[in-house]
Amino acid sequence: MLRIAVPNKGALAEAAREILQEAGYRQRRDSRELVLVDPENQVEFFYLRPRDIAVYVGKGTLDVGLTGRDLFRDAQVEGTAEEIMALGFGRSVFRLAAPVGTFSSESELTGRRIATSYDGLLHAYLERTGLDAEVVHLDGAVESSVKLGVADAIADVVETGSTLRAAGMEVFGESILDSEAVLICRAGERPEGLDVLLRRLKGVLVARRWVMIDYDIRRDLLEAATAVTPGLESPTVSPLRDETMVAVRSMVRKPDANRVMDELYALGARGILISAIHAIRL
């Protein structure tokens, strides 16, 4: 049975539940549940603190886990676990920040104190850049550290930047890490059931980005129409009772759907229909 670690709370928890549910896996109904067995799919889910997931997978206690790339890298378990799929949600950036106007470059941090909850990420960055600064560990609310005299700057995960702005801070220097939700796996032989999980998750990600389009068009306009709707590989073309007409089915990217419909209508297509894709295997 495949053992999967899932965030039990926080920004990643709900999105992780949704993608797994769309992939056909049972999910807990009570947030107090710590373990859920899905016998039909031969999977066991363990609901853990997002920060601990990489540790459990890295030690081989659990097979795979859904967590943030920032948390995975911060745990420093790359030798015993690996990132195998980006999941496209929970995007953020690990950045340096300080009160507005304090610093303009990371080079100005030499000999200064940097507060963070991501010691592993920050130490790796300092080592990579050769920057000599003191790391001050805090479990959270690092924005207050400068005002309270504990640090001169902070290194933290930034999503919208609203929290920093409210604290009178701004980011500076380069982006240290671009993060998003990822699937990680323990090192060594791939566990049984992982390939099915990967196919299902990939199918959900594709289904979220694409829609199905159906339309009728005159046979002599088919080439022009299919140039607008080439699909992933090739559109499906079916004859109609009226031999001068054909029916076309293809996949188009969801953000392009209305533009494509307009172009097809202008070409002469009619009966243009968009439908959602709930699952797909490629």
From Swiss-Prot:
Function of the molecule: Catalyzes the condensation of ATP and 5-phosphoribose 1-diphosphate to form N'-(5'-phosphoribosyl)-ATP (PR-ATP). Has a crucial role in the pathway because the rate of histidine biosynthesis seems to be controlled primarily by regulation of HisG enzymatic activity.
Cofactor(s) annotated in UniProt: Mg(2+)
Places the protein is found: Cytoplasm
Superkingdom in the source lineage: Bacteria
Keywords: Amino-acid biosynthesis, ATP-binding, Cytoplasm, Glycosyltransferase, Histidine biosynthesis, Magnesium, Metal-binding, Nucleotide-binding, Transferase
Pathway: Amino-acid biosynthesis; L-histidine biosynthesis; L-histidine from 5-phospho-alpha-D-ribose 1-diphosphate: step 1/9
Any one GO CC term of the record: cytoplasm
Main location: cytoplasm
Biological process per Gene Ontology, one example term: L-histidine biosynthetic process
Pfam families: HisG, HisG_C
Bilayer-spanning residue ranges: none
PANTHER family: ATP PHOSPHORIBOSYLTRANSFERASE, ATP PHOSPHORIBOSYLTRANSFERASE ATP-PRTASE
Similarity comment: family membership: Belongs to the ATP phosphoribosyltransferase family. Long subfamily.
EC annotation from Swiss-Prot or TrEMBL: 2.4.2.17
Catalytic activity: 1-(5-phospho-beta-D-ribosyl)-ATP + diphosphate = 5-phospho-alpha-D-ribose 1-diphosphate + ATP
GO molecular function, one term: magnesium ion binding
Keyword Manganese: no
The protein's name in its UniProt record: ATP phosphoribosyltransferase
Activity regulation statement: Feedback inhibited by histidine.
InterPro entries the record matches: ATP-PRT_HisG_long, ATP_PRibTrfase_cat, ATP_PRibTrfase_CS, ATP_PRibTrfase_HisG, HisG_C, N-reg_PII-like_a/b, N-reg_PII/ATP_PRibTrfase_C
